């Protein structure tokens, strides 16, 4: 019974936030003009001086995810990011990673990719070698998504690193994202040569062909 009441309460909260913010958030995200934080806060009728509640921010990130999934090709990225600044989404995500449950941490890591959010490498680094496999992998993929340093070093450090089908899809999406935003992507040939896992070799061979690394592509 408690679970039913809890779900109903969460649904009411979601509906309230949806009615209050969704259409204006979508309009701002699709606006071709660059809008300031003040303009966006004013359009959303949001008081930036108040401390947003975690439950509210979880719903805001859900709305941002929905907007991104439907309108990804049309979104004005600067305005979309400024919405996140207005709601202090980065602060929320980093607090979830530092103090949240394991489930909350994994959700925050996935959200960073879903909404093209951000968390500092200093916060992420503690999870890159975590004993919990799901948390470790989620952190590594988010690190690959964000980092401009050496984000693929895990393939150098662990030649036995395995990739499931889902991992390959995730990694391909990360490579597409990095290409889109202009981040450096290393040559894949070294992992074709060094990996002990056949499916990892095949994955990177396919990526070489896709990215037209003709000098690196195996014959």
Can you say where each PLM-predicted feature lies in the sequence?
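N-terminal mature-domain "stem" immediately C-terminal to a signal peptide or N-terminal signal-anchor/transmembrane
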Residues: 14-40
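Positions within ordered alpha-helical repeat solenoids
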Residues: 27-34, 46, 65-69, 114-117, ...
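Residue-level detector of extended alpha-helical repeat arrays and alpha-solenoid scaffolds
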Residues: 22, 37, 53, 57, ...
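Membrane-proximal, non-transmembrane interface segments of integral membrane proteins
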Residues: 37-107, 112, 149, 181
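Structural detector for internal amphipathic alpha-helices that build alpha-solenoid repeat scaffolds
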Residues: 73-84, 106-115, 137-148, 168-180, ...
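Short inter-helical turns and helix N-cap capping residues of alpha-solenoid HEAT/ARM repeat scaffolds
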Residues: 100-101, 131-135, 162-167, 196-197
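Amphipathic alpha-helical scaffolding segments comprising HEAT/armadillo-like alpha-solenoid repeats
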Residues: 51-54, 77, 83-97, 117-128, ...
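N-terminal signal-anchor transmembrane alpha helix of single-pass membrane proteins
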Residues: 1-19
């Amino acid at each position: 019974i408690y679970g039913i009441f809890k779900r109903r309460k969460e649904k009411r909260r979601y509906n309230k936030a949806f009615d209050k913010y969704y259409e204006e958030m979508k309009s701002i995200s699709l606006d071709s003009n660059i809008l300031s934080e003040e303009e966006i806060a004013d359009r959303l009728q949001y008081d930036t001086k108040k401390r947003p509640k975690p439950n509210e921010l979880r719903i805001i990130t859900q709305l941002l995810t929905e907007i991104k999934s439907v309108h990804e090709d049309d979104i004005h990225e600067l305005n979309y990011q400024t919405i996140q600044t207005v709601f202090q989404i980065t602060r929320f995500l980093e607090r979830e990673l530092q103090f949240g449950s394991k489930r909350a941490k994994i959700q925050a890591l996935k959200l960073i990719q879903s909404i093209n959010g951000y968390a500092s490498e200093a916060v992420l680094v503690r999870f890159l070698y975590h004993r919990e496999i799901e948390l470790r992998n989620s952190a590594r993929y988010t690190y690959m998504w964000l980092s401009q340093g050496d984000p693929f070093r895990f393939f150098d450090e662990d030649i036995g690193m395995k990739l499931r089908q889902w991992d390959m899809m995730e990694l391909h999406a990360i490579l597409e994202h990095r290409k889109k935003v202009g981040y450096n992507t290393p040559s894949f040939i070294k992992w074709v040569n060094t990996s002990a896992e056949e499916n990892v070799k095949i994955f990177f061979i396919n990526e070489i062909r896709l990215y037209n690394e003709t000098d690196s592509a195996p014959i």
